[in-house]
Curated annotation (Swiss-Prot):
Role according to the record: Electron transfer subunit of the terminal reductase during anaerobic growth on various sulfoxide and N-oxide compounds.
Alphabetical keyword list: 4Fe-4S, Electron transport, Iron, Iron-sulfur, Metal-binding, Repeat, Transport
Region (Disordered): 184-205
Entry-linked PROSITE patterns: 4FE4S_FER_1, 4FE4S_FER_2
Residues at which [4Fe-4S] cluster 2 binds: C24, C126, C129, C141
Organism encoding this protein: Shigella flexneri
Residues annotated as binding [4Fe-4S] cluster 1: C14, C17, C20, C145
Official protein name in the record: Anaerobic dimethyl sulfoxide reductase chain B
Positions contributing to [4Fe-4S] cluster 4 binding: C79, C99, C102, C105
Phylogenetic placement of the source organism: Bacteria, Pseudomonadati, Pseudomonadota, Gammaproteobacteria, Enterobacterales
Cofactor(s) for this UniProt protein: [4Fe-4S] cluster
NCBIfam families: DMSO_dmsB
Subunit structure: Heterotrimeric enzyme composed of a catalytic heterodimer (DmsAB) and a membrane anchor protein (DmsC).
């Protein structure tokens, strides 16, 4: 492998505006039911009494998630046709001419990255905009973010600059597939496995 690319996700900046998601849908000409990049809204909190005075500790934060181009992708392991594969540059992509549309990859991926396109009759997914990267550009989602909450580059450089946190609630633990992402947590972020909050927009992700 030449270079493993990855995404930096700054949850402290993300306002959940979905500009990245819409820019991706436009650039990739996606159908309404398919979104390669999705915005997770995690929220929770309750009321607590302190000497007869009630206080609330309500919280919410956003995470912009697409395919994480994992080091150990679950999708490639279950693909019976070999359509789902990892390139030399680390991008996990699907060969749409080979895909048989069995959806095993979608069932295996803990992030729901591979998505079935009803119109095309096979699986589709984020490819990291490798065509843009080859031209020295960043993925369209990164370029479109108005709050600069996303960045992209060699994962080793991103980890050196931002640390190696790769999981907060509601994401799964990173050891399952070793996702190539780095997360800067929101002040309200909860650890993976947290039960004090819930996914507030399940139909959108």
């Amino acid at each position: 492998m030449t270079t493993q690319y990855g995404f930096f996700i700054d949850s402290s900046r993300c306002a959940g505006c979905k500009t990245c998601e819409l820019a991706c849908k436009d650039y990739k000409d996606l159908t309404p039911e398919v979104s390669f990049r999705r915005i997770y809204e995690y929220a929770g909190g309750d009321w607590q009494e302190d000497n007869g005075v009630w206080h609330q500790n309500v919280f919410a934060y956003y995470l912009s998630i697409s395919c994480n181009h994992c080091e150990d992708p679950a999708c490639t392991k279950v693909c019976p046709s070999g359509a789902m594969h990892k390139r030399e540059d680390g991008f996990v992509v699907v060969d749409e001419d080979v895909c048989i549309g069995c959806r095993y990859c979608h069932m295996a991926c803990p992030y729901g990255a591979p998505q079935y396109n009803e119109t095309k009759g096979h699986m589709t997914k984020c490819d990291g905009c490798y065509d843009r990267v080859a031209e020295g550009k960043k993925p369209i989602c990164v370029e479109s973010c108005p709050l600069r909450a996303l960045d992209f580059g060699p994962i080793d450089e991103l980890r050196k600059k931002h640390g190696d946190l790769a999981a907060v609630a509601p994401l799964p633990r990173a050891h399952f597939t070793k996702p190539n992402i780095v997360i800067k947590p929101n002040a309200n972020s909860r650890p993976t496995g947290d039960t004090t909050g819930y996914l507030a927009n399940p139909k959108e992700v």
